[in-house]
A protein has these predicted regions:
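Compact mixed alphabeta submodule
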Residues: 82-111
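Disulfide-stabilized netrin-like
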Residues: 58-76
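Polar/charged alpha-helical tracts
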Residues: 13, 17, 63, 76, ...
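OB-fold ssDNA-binding interfaces and closely related basic DNA-contact patches used
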Residues: 1-61, 101, 107-111
Length: 111
C-alpha cells in the first residue's frame, strides 16, 4: 500500500483502525446523504487499485464513520474541490442518476 494524498499525516495503524472500526462503502449510502468530510486519504493498493477514504463526522450523532470509494469520478471531484477550497473540511451531497442504458451513476456535489 502506498499513500498518495492525505489531509494530515496519518499513521498507517491509525488509518486502518479507523477504517475497520466503522466502515461504509460510499455506493451503499442512501440518496441525498450529506457527507461531512473531516479527513481524507487516497492510497494505491499493492495490486494497483486506487482507493479513497473519507472520514465523515455525523452532524446528528458526532459519530465518525469512514466512507470508502474507488470511483475515479468521485476521487477527481473531491480532490478538485479540495484544491479549489484549500481545505479538507467540506460537505458533499450524494445523489444518483440513471443513464438511458440503465446504468446508475453517483453524483458527488459540493454543498
Amino acid at each position: 500500500m502506498r499513500i498518495e494524498r492525505q489531509s494530515r499525516e496519518f499513521d498507517k495503524k491509525e488509518m486502518f483502525k479507523m477504517a475497520n472500526d466503522n466502515h461504509v462503502l460510499m455506493k451503499n449510502l442512501p440518496d441525498d446523504t450529506i457527507v461531512n468530510v473531516t479527513d481524507y486519504v487516497r492510497y494505491t493498493t499493492d495490486d494497483g487499485k486506487e482507493v479513497a477514504i473519507f472520514y465523515h463526522t455525523s452532524i446528528e450523532t458526532g459519530e465518525v464513520v469512514t466512507i470508502a470509494t474507488s470511483s475515479p469520478t468521485v476521487i477527481k471531484t473531491a480532490e478538485s474541490a479540495y484544491d479549489f477550497m484549500g481545505t479538507y473540511n467540506l460537505q458533499f451531497k450524494l445523489t444518483r442518476s440513471q443513464s438511458k442504458a440503465g446504468r446508475t451513476y453517483m453524483n458527488f456535489e459540493l454543498v
